[in-house]
């Protein structure tokens, strides 16, 4: 789809495969949340979902916000693939993608960020953070950055880890059960993306309660 000058596209995709291609003209704004949440009542789920979002900024002064979250259990597999191409200058983009993986779940993030030679004065950020709740869960992260302009602000980062045992211990010392402490830490990890999705689509008011039922 083509987003014409100064138009806005905001959308939350919840538990559905996504294949989205947007060309942004001058001054347009894109804000997309891709969220895949496991069914807490079905630990045998073996679904395999692929999400691909491609954004091309072809006009000056565009803004792009891409957020992704996957909370997976059982044998579930989810891929979130983003392509953000800055072809002209003066644009901004921010990508934040998080995975929470339990049981034998598999996550895969591919983040493609390109800044063309003519895209001076671009600001672009890409962040991928992942939380493993099981020794059998696996995460693959593939950041791909191609920056051909020199007058830009561009950052990227990726991290994969487990719950902080020190934080869990401290919370248990304060009378919080280990299971509840685990839930609270997972909630805090997911909340940034879930809250943003809720602000975009008010019908998703229950999303911020999701982590508390994933026990």
Cite the ranges covered by each PLM segment:
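Active-site-proximal cofactor/substrate-binding loop regions of enzyme domains
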Residues: 172, 178-180, 185-197
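Conserved beta-strand/loop scaffold segments within soluble protein domains that form the structured core
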Residues: 1-169, 173-176, 192, 205-215
